[in-house]
Amino acid sequence: MENQLFNNNSVLAWLQYFTDNTDLDLEHVKILDITKKNKNLIPAVEAHRSVLVFTEAGHPDIFYRMYNAGLGECTVVYNEGSEPSGEIKRDKVANMIDRGINASAGMLVLNPSARSTIKFGMDNRSFASGSVKYVGSEIRSVILSKMQINEGKNICVISGESIAIEAAILDGEGDIIAVEYNSNDRNTLEDNVNQFGLNNVTIIDHVDEDTMKELAVPDVAMLVASASMEQEMECLLKINPNIEFVIYTLDFVVAASMPKICDKFGIKDPEIIQITVSKLTSKNTNNTQPAPWLITCKAGE
């Protein structure tokens, strides 16, 4: 078994320490070991009133990044050592932005303003500005729903920057592979990864067996239809013959051709739907967004 900095006994000892010194309700505490791969601290704190965080020494900007994400009013309960004993301290994240973690230990982060609902279909203003033109939040919600995201699912997103970010937030236990062919779009995606404090996103510049061979095997792939779509599908099917696809296109001709393309890869009965979103403006005019086609299908059936 892989050596762990925090095993079950040490986790239980820290839980006991905090329950003895605070009014911690174990029923509502989220346990997060960020010494393990791909653990996202900021989304966890945003979504839970109490997060017991286990971390190794270092992380010089951990509190600054939390503050920068709007979590400055959260309370951190901690001690100065690496053992669950001794004097307990409390401070606001906003007062800790100039310090890091001085010992491998547990700390309790309290967020009374934690949201009680899943952040699903985020407002486009939440994302970093840059070269990317983000899909509307309502349409993104449908795409994410079609992807059937759950904890631990590995996801590949091709040219869908905001989809990759929301998927990473929703799927904190899974690996997200984000493919961006354009260097400016990769930079914007990197800005978003840093802004949201995500550790489970790997950014690559194209899809082939070499770029994918060291990465997690994706369970589902979201693609924006392009000239390279069939090559992308072929590559992903070699990696996972049972992969699920969610494909986005504004082109009716592409949508109409998808049954034939899917049949070429042995994929039967793709579902093809069109989504239309209209908004009534303050001037009582109708603002209709572009109406994409979504194609969903699963290989190996």
Task: Please place each PLM-identified region on the residue numbering.
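Short glycine-cluster motifs
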Residues: 1-35
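Conserved SAM-binding loop of SAM-dependent methyltransferases across substrates and taxa
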Residues: 161-173
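Short beta-strand element of Class I
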Residues: 173-179, 245
